[in-house]
């Protein structure tokens, strides 16, 4: 009887322990699943702290070859001396997965200011190398993320150097806020930005990422008509020479036009400031008409729409209203040499 009771007690203890282990395993699995981001990348529990006393570099895994998928790496650079700053310079060999709608959503490298949590920049793609970044204090954080799709090469390599405050002042001129400019001066300042991301970050440093995402929410887009220039058949060399004269003497060619001047909109800033259009150009030295002087004029004109960023002052409210808009521009598709006095005849 005692033996039977001992066996029952042992069985109960074993069952209770197995149940606790199963519950623990289920809890761990749930925590692991909830720790994943929506794109399937698991966030790291700890960042790698690098004590900086001299120049050095960090890079994506396997640089300059294809980096691995499903990766999140965070480095925090901390200078030993508190009165120095850290400057980051990207290697010319830069390439991550391309952005979607000019927004780096999937694979990207991001630089953050640890003192206030502000994002200094997020980059991806391979069309341009990111510019230099300078910390506000003696620390700076770098974050690299890749999702489970489309890894690229060569990744990135960032060289870091130490700067004293007076070096920073001489190297980086003061950038005035948008509110310090009139509309015409702000138009000139906007011309210096090479990407929409840099422009929005300048206009709205505290909420530029939200503004950039809001900017691309509309799904509609007006497309201009496509135009194709036909080619003539070329039989012999003389025909070729004559055809080249015809093609390049008075033909549609690329011209850059200022949107504010072209649209006569001095109350608005457009970005990009200028666009390429087809306009008639060239000379008419071999004009076939019997007149003293010929000129090149368009004989077929079409209107095409181009989507650009529009910045307009808000009435009674500080800041600029930002929106994507379609602007109509004239394109010359066919040109002809005519007598100057008969241009309108």
From Swiss-Prot:
Q: What are the coiled-coil residue ranges? A: none
Q: Which SMART domains match?
A: CUB
GO CC annotation, single: membrane
Q: Where is the signal peptide?
A: 1-22
- GO aspect biological process, one term: platelet-derived growth factor receptor signaling pathway
Known post-translational modifications?
Answer: Proteolytic removal of the N-terminal CUB domain releasing the core domain is necessary for unmasking the receptor-binding epitopes of the core domain. Cleavage after basic residues in the hinge region (region connecting the CUB and growth factor domains) gives rise to the receptor-binding form.
Q: Which InterPro entries match?
A: CUB_dom, Cystine-knot_cytokine, PDGF/VEGF_dom, Sperma_CUB_dom_sf
- Gene encoding this polypeptide? PDGFC
**Predominant localisation class:** secreted
Subcellular location per the Swiss-Prot or TrEMBL entry: Secreted
Which residue intervals define the domain CUB in the entry?
46-163
Q: Where is this site: Cleavage?
A: 225-226, 231-232, 234-235
Its annotated function is as follows: Growth factor that plays an essential role in the regulation of embryonic development, cell proliferation, cell migration, survival and chemotaxis. Potent mitogen and chemoattractant for cells of mesenchymal origin. Required for normal skeleton formation during embryonic development. Required for normal skin morphogenesis during embryonic development. Plays an important role in wound healing, in angiogenesis and blood vessel development.
* GO MF term (any one): platelet-derived growth factor receptor binding
Q: Name one Pfam family in it.
A: PDGF
| Entry similarity comment | Belongs to the PDGF/VEGF growth factor family.
- Glycosylated residues? 25, 55
| Disulfide cross-links | 104-124, 250-294, 280-335, 287-337
- Please report the name of this protein according to its UniProt entry: Platelet-derived growth factor C
Organism annotation:
Gekko japonicus
């Amino acid at each position: 009887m005692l033996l039977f009771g001992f066996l029952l007690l042992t069985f109960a203890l074993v069952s209770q322990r197995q149940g606790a282990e199963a519950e623990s395993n289920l809890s761990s699995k749930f925590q692991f699943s909830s720790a994943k981001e929506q794109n399937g990348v698991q966030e790291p529990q700890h960042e790698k702290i690098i004590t900086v006393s001299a120049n050095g570099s960090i890079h994506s895994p396997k640089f300059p070859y294809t980096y691995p998928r499903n990766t999140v790496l965070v480095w925090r650079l901390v200078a030993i001396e508190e009165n120095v700053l850290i400057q980051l310079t990207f290697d010319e060999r830069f390439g991550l997965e391309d952005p979607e709608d000019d927004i780096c959503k999937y694979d990207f490298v991001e630089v953050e200011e640890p003192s206030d949590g502000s994002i200094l920049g997020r980059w991806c793609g391979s069309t341009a190398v990111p510019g230099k970044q300078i910390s506000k204090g003696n620390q700076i954080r770098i974050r690299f993320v890749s999702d489970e799709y489309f890894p690229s090469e060569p990744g990135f390599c960032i060289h870091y150097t130490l700067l004293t405050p007076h070096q920073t002042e001489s190297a980086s001129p003061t950038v005035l806020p948008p509110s310090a400019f009139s509309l015409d001066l702000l138009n000139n300042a906007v011309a210096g930005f090479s990407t929409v991301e840099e422009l929005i970050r300048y206009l709205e440093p505290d909420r530029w990422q939200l503004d950039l995402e809001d900017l691309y929410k509309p799904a509609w887009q007006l497309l201009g008509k496509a135009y194709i220039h036909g080619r003539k058949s070329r039989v012999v060399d003389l025909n070729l020479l004559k055809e080249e004269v015809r093609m390049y003497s008075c033909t549609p060619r690329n011209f850059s036009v200022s949107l504010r001047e072209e649209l006569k909109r001095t109350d608005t800033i457009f970005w990009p400031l200028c666009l390429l259009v087809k306009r008639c150009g060239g000379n008419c030295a071999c004009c076939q008409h019997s007149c003293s002087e010929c000129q090149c004029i368009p004989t077929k004109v079409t209107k095409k729409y181009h989507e650009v960023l529009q910045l307009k002052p808000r009435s009674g409210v500080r800041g600029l209203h930002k929106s994507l808009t379609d602007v109509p521009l004239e394109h010359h598709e066919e040109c002809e040499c005519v007598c100057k006095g008969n241009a309108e005849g």
